[in-house]
């Protein structure tokens, strides 16, 4: 996938770099981002990408490559983060936001005997695991409207309340039953969207504790054909995550050289950007 994905990604880095300069540094943020993305695209450590011989398959590369310690020291910092955020925004804005958003989480597991202090034990597909989780809110664009990486044990409802206010527009948010909590319904409504999750039957909404009016609205929706057909579209989430891991350089469990919350977050960021270029290229929107 290198020949297809690297040129549009590299040109986007250069485009953003025209408006983004950091003073008093030997290597601009775009150079560090390029090295990290090249490593992520090939599922290699940064030390590999800092060696010029490993760029022999492309002419699209920085004139000078930094030492691996320079990348390691700065890649998780504010300057590179601000640069990547602008790259993310420009790629995302090549498509219009949808009225239908999809909220979910993807476990990013590490070895059960890993000494990574930030990796925590929590629920994963098929049982318990150790690692992190990527929480996303997608609205039919190449990148999530908002996303966050947390230790695996952090509650999805807690993270959802942080993600929802960051999503522009109005419409519906589809999610699984893990998000069935009144505070999440209220957070979605405050951002202009109606959350739709499956409901326990037959007494949903009849408890004596606080019931969000937006949760009751969800119950009413799911009793009708429109609500049921609307929720069926949640299957798009599985396709989003499935496609994100189905190509070389795609999103998968963090490799052994990626440990610690900050580094895992930056690694996921790189994978999301790579996947975004893949999506846009498929849709003819990479120019």
Predicted regions mapped to residue ranges:
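A short glycine/serine-rich beta->alpha loop
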Residues: 19-25, 59-60, 258-259
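DNA-recognition alpha helix
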Residues: 46-61
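Alpha-helical architecture
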Residues: 65, 102, 174, 236-237
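Major-groove recognition helix of helix-turn-helix-like DNA-binding domains
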Residues: 60-78
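Basic, amphipathic alpha-helical segments enriched in Lys/Arg and hydrophobic/aromatic residues
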Residues: 227-287
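Helix-centered, glycine/charged polyanion-binding patches within enzymatic domains
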Residues: 178, 182-249
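Polybasic low-complexity intrinsically disordered regions
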Residues: 20-34, 38-41, 51, 73-76, ...
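Basic, low-complexity segments
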Residues: 1-22
């Amino acid at each position: 996938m290198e020949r297809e994905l690297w040129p549009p990604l590299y040109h986007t880095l250069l485009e953003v770099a025209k408006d983004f300069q950091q003073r008093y540094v030997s290597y601009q943020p775009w150079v560090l981002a390029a090295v990290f993305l090249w490593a992520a695209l090939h599922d290699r450590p940064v030390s590999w990408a800092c060696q010029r011989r490993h760029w022999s398959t492309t002419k699209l590369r920085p004139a000078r490559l930094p030492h691996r310690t320079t990348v390691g020291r700065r890649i998780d910092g504010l300057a590179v983060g601000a640069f990547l955020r602008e790259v993310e925004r420009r790629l995302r804005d090549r498509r219009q936001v949808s009225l239908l958003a999809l909220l979910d989480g993807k476990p990013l597991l590490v070895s059960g005997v890993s000494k990574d202090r930030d990796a925590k034990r929590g629920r994963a597909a098929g049982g318990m695991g150790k690692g992190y989780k990527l929480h996303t809110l997608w609205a039919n664009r190449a990148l999530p409207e908002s996303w966050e990486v947390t230790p695996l044990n952090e509650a999805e409802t807690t993270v959802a309340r942080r993600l929802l206010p960051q999503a522009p527009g109005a419409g519906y948010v589809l999610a699984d039953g893990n998000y069935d909590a009144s505070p999440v319904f209220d957070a979605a409504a405050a951002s202009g969207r109606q959350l739709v999750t499956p409901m326990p039957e037959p007494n949903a909404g009849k408890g004596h504790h606080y019931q969000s009016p937006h949760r009751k609205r969800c119950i009413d929706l799911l009793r009708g054909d429109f609500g049921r057909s609307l929720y069926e579209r949640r299957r798009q989430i599985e396709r989003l995550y499935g496609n994100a891991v189905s190509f070389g350089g795609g999103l998968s469990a963090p490799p052994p050289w990626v440990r610690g919350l900050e580094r895992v977050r930056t690694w996921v960021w790189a994978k999301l950007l790579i996947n975004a270029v893949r999506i846009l290229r498929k849709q003819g929107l990479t120019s």
